[in-house]
Amino acid sequence: MFSLQKKALQHIYMTPENASELTKDLLQHLGLYWNGPIIKMDTVVYLHNKIFSNRSVLKYALAKQANITIIKTLVLWVEPEYALAQALKHNRKDVLECIFSYHLTTPKYHHIMHLTSSQELFEFFHLFICKSKNYNARMECLLYAATLYNFPNILEKNREYIIRHSIGNSLFAIACKERHIHLIAWFVTAGVLDTYDDSTLFNTAFKLGDYSLLEVACDLPIIYPDYLIISMMQTAIQKNYFRFFKKLLTHFNIYRQIIITDAAYYNRRKILLLLLNQNIFNNFAILCALSAAIKGHASKKTLNLLISQLDSQMTVVDSVYYSIIKYNNIDCIPLLMQIKTFKIETLISIAVHGNNINIIAACKAFLPKDTLYHLVLKMAIVSRNYKLFKLYTEKENPMYIFTTIKAIISNLVNYTVVQAVAIEYLRKFHQERQLPIVPLLMVLAEHNYITKFKKTCYAANMSDQNVKRALIKCLFIASQKNYCQIFKYCFGSLLKVLSKHERVKFFNSVVFAKKLASYYDHQNMIHLIDSLIERFRYLIKD
């Protein structure tokens, strides 16, 4: 095999018009090695046992800058689109002219325009393929294509046309979509946009997840309003784009409470760590973020991160408690117990008001039983939540509950309205469980509920020795606390049921009651006892 390439390229070979046979001279012009005859058959060129497709031959010819006459023949052997594409790739305007001369009516080939790197060739190619006869339509088509395929020189050349016909914004949208960074910067700085929306570039960057677009938006000579940057930071938090958030934070240096709150809510621990390391946010802001983290059911690591940043003496804000209740976040309670000022009693109080049984049940692990029941029943009474009251009393020991409510009633001395509710709940509970009457009588006498006391006595078995003893005790309570009506009612009730033998002891009890009244200087009670003794002395003596 030997090469005839150099010698062959020195001669111009005219291909026969029918182009039915590819001779050795043509092969030499193409820059190939010749070692035998070659024949064109349909779309394949045969060289003995070697096969070259027409496309390969054309591509090779263009690469070796073969004679135009040869190339003109080859472009007839391939599809027009392929021929155009290869001509664009090799920046051959002469080949394009040849193809267009063969194909006077060509379909739209906009999709291959980008194959050329030459601005001149791009415009020339567009001139042939654009079908519109209207100048403005052709120009707009060219500019859209130039934007689509990143030809800034064409846009700069036609800058005045873009401004005059107000097509800058639509072209800018294409540049953003295609991520042409230099074009985007040109649109913003060239003054071709009618109304530039500051958020457009940011929104596109987030939509496409393109960090380079965000960098362009940040580096443009534009003063963005704070609300826009905050909004973009929130978007970065929601999408968990850490790089985007860090770029916005470091570039614009904007810190707001809503940012750390959102980061906590969406459980973005890396972003939270970045924010907290700046030492910008105070305890209140961190507490608000903690509340948001509870609301969003953030991970334990996120909660611990926020808790570790708090001052141990910082008072826990109500929003933290309300978030636990409202969003039923039980898992965070053990973690919050690390904060010295976190009060489980406050949490239970709010849970009772919110009727959140799950939270109340979860608090059992952190309080003694007596404290828990006292607190829950008290709050149920205060909030008039009889359903909760019944839930926590129906399965417990009745006397334990009775004793607990009795203690609650004693604590509500200064709250007469609430105390009255507690007494009513106690009476209902006493009636439902059919407890002994004596403890209830003592409680009613202790707190001077005369009407309920009378009703209870009326329902009691007055001949029962326990009831009699209870009424005598009630005499002492009444004299000690100056409850004249209670004393008078107990006195009259006992006279009716006591035997003659018992009346002597009763008289001694009345005398002792008078001494108690004297000790506490209850003059009204003393006068009452004296009058009762005088009035009923004959009964007592009998």
Curated annotation (Swiss-Prot):
Keywords: Early protein. Plays a role in virus cell tropism, and may be required for efficient virus replication in macrophages. This is Protein MGF 505-11L. It comes from the Viruses. Disulfide bonds: none annotated. InterPro entries: MGF_505 (IPR004858). It holds the Pfam family DUF249. Induction: Expressed in the early phase of the viral replicative cycle. Belongs to the asfivirus MGF 505 family.
